[in-house]
Design a protein with these regions (language model features):
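A conserved beta-strand-loop-helix scaffold within acyl/acetyltransferase catalytic domains
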Residues: 1-50, 84, 92-218
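Active-site/acyl-donor-binding loops of N-acyltransferases
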Residues: 4-8, 46-48, 90-114, 239-300
């Protein structure tokens, strides 16, 4: 059996074999392609009416993909270019929505714990200490999956937002090895009141998902959860901690609360901006109807 190209630790986790296998567990077909020793994973998505499209999460676009897309009757190829140079000679259109956060917050954790604490906003340090004084206990184990899902339901109902189906999280936790995907929980008086999913990938730890019980918001468990994950990431050899999506523009945007929370962990770090998602049209008719449907949805 031919060995697949090794995906560098500098490649985003969304291009890892673990993520590809998880996507297959959710029912999606995936493809692997290589060129000049570089491997990419492609995920096939299906939509009502307009059919299928390819998505390359945080990966490079290969010209050879166009032939594969035509063979598989794909409407368009979506990808997240690293910079403008990478799309300079491609016929692309901006996607109607971004598949991944366009702005992320990543801190350098090669520093000592003392320095990391000193670079936090005073309120963040205070809340970490408060959670410790309140007796919050942090644990990490996939045995807490039901507690995590309970908190996800509570958070979705409270904020009026749509999370992934429960089966999505179960398959993620079951498929991705526990040494890579860690489920952290915060317990208060023997009750799980907050939980996070964190990926340890190469030199980077990535905060994927979090959920809380708002009844216990005053004990500041989410702050201690993040701090424990940062310390564990340091001890495992990670050099960066990726808090995921933020939105630093717009005063009253829906991201303001979570952005303020994340940015509090470093006053010396600036967020990283990406170009967002772009599409290469394979079937103009399918893509035309797709954009019409998207416009109708945005109005409703």
């Amino acid at each position: 059996m031919e060995e697949k190209a090794i995906i560098s630790e500098n490649i985003d986790f969304l291009q890892s074999e673990e993520w590809r296998e998880f996507q297959e567990k959710t029912g999606k077909q995936t493809f692997h392609m290589e060129r000049n020793g570089i491997g990419i994973n492609v995920i096939e998505h299906k939509l009502p009416v307009v059919g299928k499209y390819f998505y390359i999460p945080r990966g490079e676009f290969f010209e050879e993909l166009i032939e594969l897309a035509k063979k598989e009757k794909i409407g368009w190829i979506r990808f997240d270019p690293k910079n403008e140079k990478s799309i300079k000679n491609l016929k692309v259109v901006k996607a109607p929505h971004d598949m991944q956060p366009k702005e992320t917050f990543v801190i350098d954790i090669k520093k000592s714990e003392e320095q990391l604490l000193s670079e936090m906003k005073p309120k963040t340090r205070y809340n970490i200490n408060l959670a410790q004084k309140k007796g919050i206990a942090i644990n990490s184990s996939i045995k807490y999956v039901d507690d995590f899902l309970r908190l996800v339901r509570m958070t979705a109902e409270r904020k009026g937002i749509k999370f992934h189906p429960e089966d999505y999280y179960r398959k993620m936790i079951e498929t991705i090895p526990e040494n890579i995907l860690k489920l952290y929980v915060a317990e208060y008086n023997n009750k799980v009141i907050a939980a996070n999913l964190v990926v340890f990938s190469g030199k980077t730890a990535i905060y994927l998902h979090g959920a809380t019980d708002d009844e216990y918001r005053n004990v500041m468990a989410p702050y201690l959860l993040q701090w424990q994950a940062i310390k564990d990431a340091k001890n495992s050899g990670c050099e960066r901690y990726d808090f995921g999506g933020v939105k630093t523009t717009g005063v009253n945007n829906s991201w303001s609360g979570i952005t303020k929370f994340k940015l509090g962990f470093s006053q010396v770090t600036k967020s990283v901006e990406f170009l967002g998602s772009y599409d290469i049209i394979i079937n103009p008719i399918k893509y035309f109807f797709y954009r019409i449907i998207q416009r109708i949805k945005s109005i409703l």
